[in-house]
Regions:
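Short helix-initiation/N-cap motifs at beta->coil->alpha
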Residues: 77-89, 134-137, 171-186
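A ligand-binding cleft/hinge motif common to bilobed small-molecule-binding domains
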Residues: 86, 102-111, 160-163, 190-226, ...
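Extended ligand-binding regions for polar small-molecule ligands
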Residues: 62-71, 132-133, 140, 155, ...
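Alpha-to-beta junction loops
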Residues: 38-39, 74-76, 93-101, 146-148, ...
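Ligand-binding cleft/hinge of the Venus flytrap
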Residues: 51-53, 65-75, 140-143, 155-175, ...
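Extracytoplasmic small-molecule ligand-binding "clamshell" domains
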Residues: 26-102, 111, 264
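Periplasmic-binding protein-like
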Residues: 121-125, 207-246, 269-286
Length: 286
């Protein structure tokens, strides 16, 4: 479901820049409710969090964040887009108060930021050139051959590939998803590792030049298929804001409106159900 932004929502097309000495400060919930502006960052990644052609924030993260902000009595949101790898540093440098990019909740990230409870859950995918000329169907193929696999800088696919013993020499790092199609169609890499939803979106945008690998097999690490749980992220000093968001998120996830947002952006009923299967405490513990 794509909900329209309310007139009072503000959009910023690029991240604001602070000096090198900037440090994270706790977002004051009372001030936000009293006319303040909630600064929210996304990584311009469909369907998780992105700016559309009208400069409006869309995606499962922004749509749910808008509902939560309204429920908390926060009247203004300023949206910032930045590279995925800059999301956590931006929180730490007080460039924004919250990240709504459905960033996977991982132990190493939990050491750097606070997470809400999961808002979403999603599996993996593989983008390949049209016709899948190298016959690639899983990430393990890249550990057992000389083929190269691309990932986005800062994405958790790096940890997955490392766990599967894919050599660093076969991993190509690109700045963002926008470069993925050209990366696989020009042969710079033989595949692009990303979530299944991202891969599907890229394949649709490629105009037939690339496709999602068919019969893709989810990677298995430590005997378990890999699945990610995404949540909202905050600076370590923003516990009060995180707790307030958690309260409203728990309520909203019980509604049909939340389910419609998930399905509207391509999440399956299983994805929605899986989002309840892990807590942030469990995910942070590893």
């Amino acid at each position: 479901m794509k909900t329209a932004l309310k007139p009072w929502l503000l959009a910023a097309a690029a991240a604001c820049v602070l000096g090198p000495g900037a440090a994270a400060q706790a977002a004051d919930l009372a001030a936000l409710r009293n006319g303040g502006t909630l600064r929210v960052a996304i990584a311009n990644e469909i369907p998780y969090g992105y700016m559309d052609l009208n400069g409006e924030a869309k995606g499962v993260g922004p749509d749910v964040a808008k509902h939560i902000a309204e429920a908390l009595g926060i009247g203004k949101i300023e949206w910032t887009t930045t590279a995925f790898g800059s999301l956590i540093p931006g929180l730490q440098a007080d460039r924004y108060d919250m990240v709504a990019a459905e960033m996977a909740i991982l132990p190493q990230r939990c050491e750097q930021v606070l997470y809400s409870e999961p808002n979403s859950s999603y599996g993996e995918g593989l983008l390949v050139a049209k016709g899948n000329p190298k016959n690639l169907h899983d990430y393990e193929n890249f550990a057992a051959s000389d083929h190269k696999i691309a990932i986005m800088a800062g994405a958790d696919q790096l940890e997955i590939l490392q766990a599967l013993k894919v050599p660093a020499s076969r991993i190509v790092t690109i700045a963002n998803n926008a470069d993925a199609i050209s990366t696989v169609t020009t042969g710079r890499a033989d595949g692009y590792a990303a979530t299944s939803l991202t891969v599907g979106e890229l394949a649709a945008k490629s105009r037939g030049k690339a496709e999602a690998a068919r019969d893709f097999k989810d990677p298995v690490v430590d005997g378990q298929p890999v699945r990610s749980w995404g949540g909202f992220a905050f600076s370590k000093d923003s516990g009060a804001l995180r707790d307030a968001v958690n309260q409203e998120l728990a309520k909203f996830k019980k509604t049909e409106d939340w389910k419609k947002i998930m399905s509207g952006y391509g999440f399956s009923a299983e994805d929605a159900s899986q989002s309840f299967e892990r807590s942030t405490a469990q995910l942070c513990a590893g």
